[in-house]
């Protein structure tokens, strides 16, 4: 366990070291918002554009009503989230962190990365959360079957990553939230009612996700 934690912390430190020439992990995005957090949130949602857009599209003020803080950044991959995990999650002292990540890694936003390494970055965030008294919730990646580039076939990669995450939760007593199963269509993608572009949820899609997530925050 100590070796795993050391590797996770070393990985995060290495990512931070890469920021010397610029704000690669976008620490600045939530710098002021983090200062304005006056009490520990029930949960922080860590993620990419799916999480980033959630507060703007959610009906009924889901975030404020449940003391949830969103820390998604559009376009980010798991290594960037790992680099800013302390600043945007641990420093806020939440009870829970829900990690929804991996779509942009599969899309190769920062270049090719094996599914095993995407999984490893997510596990590193989980281990760091646990070591700091924050309860991690691993979220399945949402369905995706529209290729960003012709050579990328996302559907089988999403399914493989989700299988790895589900197996990890089963062996490590970590909470797991399955968005994939109730939202996937018969082509392993998101139907139009849940995502007009096949990736980013509609208000109806977010409403489904909220009903799935809330029971895990108990």
Which residues are covered by each model-predicted region?
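Positively charged n-region of N-terminal signal peptides that target proteins for export
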Residues: 1-4
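Serine-esterase "nucleophile elbow" of acetyl-processing enzymes
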Residues: 19-96
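Extracytoplasmic/secreted cell-surface and envelope-processing proteins
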Residues: 106-111, 115, 146-149, 186
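Charged helix-capping and loop-helix junction motifs
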Residues: 114-123, 154-162
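Charged, glycine-enriched surface loops/patches
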Residues: 115-139, 168-174
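Catalytic His-Asp segment of secreted/periplasmic serine-dependent ester chemistry enzymes
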Residues: 9, 13, 18, 142-218
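Cell-envelope and extracellular/periplasmic
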Residues: 71-74, 101-106, 110
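Active-site segments of SGNH/GDSL-like serine hydrolases
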Residues: 100-106, 125-158
């Amino acid at each position: 366990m100590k070796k795993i934690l050391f590797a996770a912390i070393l990985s995060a430190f290495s990512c931070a070291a890469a920021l010397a020439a610029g704000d690669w992990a976008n620490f600045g995005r939530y710098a002021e918002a983090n200062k304005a957090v006056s009490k520990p949130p029930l949960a922080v949602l860590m993620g990419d554009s799916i999480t980033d857009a959630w507060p703007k599209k959610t009906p009924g003020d889901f975030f404020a009503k449940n003391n949830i803080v969103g820390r998604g950044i559009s376009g980010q991959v798991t290594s960037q989230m790992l680099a800013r995990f302390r600043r945007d999650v641990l420093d806020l002292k939440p009870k829970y962190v829900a990690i929804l990540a991996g779509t942009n890694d599969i899309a190769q936003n920062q270049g090719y990365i094996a599914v095993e390494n995407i999984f490893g970055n997510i596990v590193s965030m989980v281990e760091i959360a646990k070591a700091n008294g924050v309860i991690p919730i691993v979220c399945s990646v949402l369905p995706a079957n529209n290729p960003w580039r012709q050579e990328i076939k996302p559907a089988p990669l999403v399914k493989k990553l989700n299988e790895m995450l589900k197996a990890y939760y089963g062996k490590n007593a970590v909470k797991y939230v399955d968005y994939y199963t109730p939202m996937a269509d018969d082509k392993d993608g998101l139907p139009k009612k849940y995502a007009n572009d096949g990736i980013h949820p509609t208000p109806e899609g977010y409403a489904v996700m909220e009903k799935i997530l809330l029971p895990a925050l108990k």
